[in-house]
A protein has these predicted regions:
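Conserved SET/PR-domain catalytic core that frames the SAM/AdoMet-binding pocket
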Residues: 36-53
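Anion-binding (especially nucleotide phosphate/pyrophosphate-binding) glycine-rich loop
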Residues: 34, 66-180, 184
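Short Gly/aromatic-enriched secondary-structure transition segments
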Residues: 51-66
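Long, Pro/Ser/Thr-rich low-complexity/intrinsically disordered regulatory tracts in eukaryotic proteins
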Residues: 26-28, 48, 71
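Short linear interaction motifs
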Residues: 19-29
Length: 184
């Protein structure tokens, strides 16, 4: 049987997916952009901001951003490609994937997919529609394909330093700063 938390997570996911919108005005307007972000240390209240707990009890968390040996260890680089494809490359996980059709990019439900986070970013930012369309149409509109490199340097998974959430933020920030989402 599934617990209340699982039911709640499915409801939140379903609501989020319903509310995603495809941004038909997005364009690639620069050739390459890199985002580097710091890590996060939780000083108090950890997990009290996580549903369903925070919905029932409220939540307050105190975090601080930190550098690792003076460096921002979470990095995402987006680079425009002339080819009609999307490439994901996770250097720290040593995985590489190339996509020339849209359906695999729209499939974000597999928690073991090494690119689930990157795919979710493209859906959440409106770069890829949640259903339908073709990758050729999307990339024609954007002005080309692109490669997304990601890397978390010298930080083990599960360290408690926020690498997954910060990598998510870096992906979104890189998409916006590459001006895939061009706001006129």
């Amino acid at each position: 049987s599934r617990g209340l938390g699982d039911v709640y997570k499915r409801q939140v996911l379903a609501t989020t997916l319903r509310n995603l919108s495809y941004n038909e005005n997005a364009r690639i307007v620069t050739e390459k952009h890199t985002v580097k972000l710091p890590l996060r240390v939780n000083w108090g209240g950890g997990w009290s901001d996580t549903p369903p707990y925070c919905n029932e009890n409220g939540g307050t968390v105190l975090n601080v951003a930190i550098l690792l040996n003076g460096q921002k260890p979470v990095e995402v680089t987006l680079e425009k490609l002339s080819e009609k494809k999307i490439v994901f490359d996770s250097r720290d996980m040593d995985v590489h994937g190339e996509f020339d059709t849209i359906e695999p990019l729209q499939a974000t439900g597999d928690p073991f997919d090494p690119f689930a986070l990157q795919k979710a970013c493209l859906l959440a930012c409106g770069i890829i529609p949640k259903e339908g369309s073709s990758l050729d149409e999307v990339l024609d509109r954007l002005g080309g394909g692109f490669e997304m490199h990601s890397e978390v340097t010298n930080v083990p998974k599960g360290s408690g330093l926020g690498t997954s959430s910060i990598l998510s933020a870096a992906c979104v920030k890189a998409v916006f700063e590459l001006s895939l989402i061009h706001i006129s």
